[in-house]
Amino acid sequence: MKFANQCVAGNTAPEQMLTNFEMQKEIVKTGNIKDVLQSKNHLLVQILKEPISTKGPRLTCEISLAGRFLVLVPFNDSVGVSKKIDSAEERKRLKVLVESLKPKNFGVIVRTVAAGKNASELHQDLLTLQNKWQEMMRNLKGAVPVTKVLSEMNKTTGILRDLLSPQFNKIVTNDVKLAKEVEDYITQIAPEKKDIVQRYTGTVPIFDNYGITKQI
């Protein structure tokens, strides 16, 4: 809340990240919300889940920015590594590497797909996330409720970011716009794999052609 108010007032320079921000004590989550918040307080929140039927969106004040290999967690200082990476030695390597790269007052979660990646690849992903954070800070200046200060990538690129792995050898779509979108994103994050994107032009429906209809 303090950070959001500073950004709205223009008292925080985006390029400083959180270097000069004085971290606050952790809020006791079993306490009474009235002891922490008052009416008309301005909060920086992130949507965790879109609204469904009569239920509104699920929100959190614990902001996180997901990248290809890393997740940036502001107002934190720890580095966690996915336990799905089997090798203890590799987990240790990644932890030490990311600890040397991360900015002050930011935590980082190392995703499973980061296994085997070098310092340059991880650093580039981290810089991309830092740029997103700085963009959000710039958008906060002068913002009034309710303002969207940062947009997540669309569903297509979000799925690719989370699921694309070295085992992928083909991505097929019958939509020209979608094919271009996927190819552009893969060219950005894994240029060596851009040729796996193919556009289906057959007369048989694409789901029937690949036997997907039977599975659903």
Predicted regions and their residues:
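DE-rich acidic low-complexity regions and acidic surface loops
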Residues: 1-216
